[in-house]
UniProtKB/Swiss-Prot annotation:
This is Alpha-L-arabinofuranosidase C. Synergistic reactions with other polysaccharadide degrading enzymes such as lytic polysaccharide monooxygenases (LPMOs) are important for industrial applications. It comes from the Eukaryota. GO terms for cellular component: extracellular region. GO terms for biological process: L-arabinose metabolic process; xylan catabolic process. Residues 1-26 form the signal peptide. Keywords: Carbohydrate metabolism, Glycosidase, Hydrolase, Polysaccharide degradation, Secreted, Signal, Xylan degradation. SUPFAM superfamilies: Arabinanase/levansucrase/invertase. The gene is ABF62C. It catalyses: Hydrolysis of terminal non-reducing alpha-L-arabinofuranoside residues in alpha-L-arabinosides.
Amino acid sequence: MRFLKAKAGLVASGAFLLASVPVVAADCALPSTYSWTSTGPLANPKSGWTAIKDFSNVVFNNNHIVYASTTDANGNYGSMNFGTFSDWSGMASASQNKMSFSAVAPTLFYFQPKNIWVLAYQWGSSTFTYRTSNDPTNANGWSSEQALFSGQITGSSTGAIDQTLIGDSTHMYLFFAGDNGKIYRSSMPINNFPGNFGTSSEVVLSDSQNNLFEAVQVYTVKGQNKYLMIVEAIGSQGRYFRSFTATSLGGSWTPQATSESQPFAGKANSGATWTNDISHGDLVRTNPDQTMTIDPCNLQFLYQGKNPSAGGNYNTLPWRPGVLTLKN
């Protein structure tokens, strides 16, 4: 998500009723090459907004809960959530709820160890900030803002942006980008979360600006002892995602599907006809918790796209939601 500054009681027991997914006999490995089908644009922004973008999605009680950034005609950013809906066809008619604070480039998840929902975002009172809630469907039911990360990065025109969070059995990890060809990581013991990761981070990937631009996401791959990272890149035909894998969240990352001609997701393999860009979004997770678990047997990707003829200032581009479904 690029920005040039001129960017009650749902969990009483901690038990989840998740959206039904097809039952499979065995776990699936990640494919070596990806091919998708795509929906068209699933919703238009309500009056006053030019775009809905930077999606974070969980499935809870058989419904999607989606948070997103918004922009207006002047390039000002805000944030919103959708009213819940059970399948993607319901997104168009779901309510669009403006938030009283700006949670730009949000990450939404349920932190199971402390039975609390967490919403993390950028451009608050610290480099990254978070709020907590017992009811993630209520766009304006969040706690006061707390610092998530207080560090700074160098060699970046935007500073640290596009955070994501993920946990294993012992630690929580913060990953983020900087529109500068680098992906960064910080960590803390899981017992200290939610809290402030502090000021220190390390570079875990380094490449050209175009190859590692923004919108990093990290997931646990169900049944595979593996983690998947996706990063948005700038290509000759639009935005696309490159993928990397690791066997430890604290370890090194190996390129997986990283070319524009054979990406994780992009114009070359998305199946989308309404957009050339496959941009900032979230893979659909198997549960809402901090493990950020995905199932390659049933993989979908909520992304932002736009009409290829739309141009001008990035911050006023007409981004809309779409969903990719992996061909198995």
